[in-house]
Amino acid sequence: MYSYKNKNLHCENINLIELSKKVGSPFYCYSSKILESKYSELTDAFKEEDLLVCFSLKANSNQSIIKTFSSLGSGADVVSIGELKRALKAKIPPNKIVFSGVGKNTDEIIFAIKNKILMINVESISELKQISTQAANLNMIAPISLRVNPDIEAGGNEKISTGKKQDKFGISIKEAIDVYELASNLDNIEIKGIDVHIGCLLYTSDAADDSLR
């Protein structure tokens, strides 16, 4: 998608030197064809499964990129009310949006419930109770999954590890069953699944396989 022509770098046949003269520099230039290709690689690999691929807006919240993924049928993984609003603005259906992240505030929880998103990934018992309270106040049901810490050595950079028992994210795997039982007894909570995030910069599926087991 990127190539040199007459010693000038091009992106999808667009001369980036000429583009810089129009928009100024520095600037960001993204190839929609590359985005489409990478998305297709994922969906094709799991075409036999009932799978929803969600683009993580924290990776890049450029509105045009979100719209590109929306046009491909992608869902969205968001970590703030701002990202949630950007996903909705890009016409990603609410039932394809997952709200992850720590420290969700009351306004974010209420907005997510009102917009009937796919699920809220719950980080702690206190957050679960907060979601339940707000859902009851709205007379609505809040779909949730629990972020479970599987105590897995993912193999990435230790400083960005999120899946070991000493890491401060999620609910420990030893407590998970009890918290799921608690959630099942809350009238305004609907359990939709389980959430696991073990880290970044992982280049094999080994750690993911271990966490699933």
Put a short name on every predicted segment.
Residues M1-A142, E181, N185-I191:
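A charged N-terminal "starter" segment
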Residues S56, P143-N149, D195-H197:
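Short beta-strand segments
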Residues N62-I65, E83-K85, N105-E108, P150-K165, ...:
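Conserved radical SAM core fold
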Residues C11, C29-Y30, A59, A154, ...:
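Generic structural "secondary-structure junction" signal
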Residues Y203-D210:
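Conserved small/polar residues in nucleotide/adenosyl-binding loops
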Residues E127-A183:
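Conserved anion-binding
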Residues V23, D195-C200:
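Short, histidine-centered active-site or binding-site loop motifs used for metal coordination
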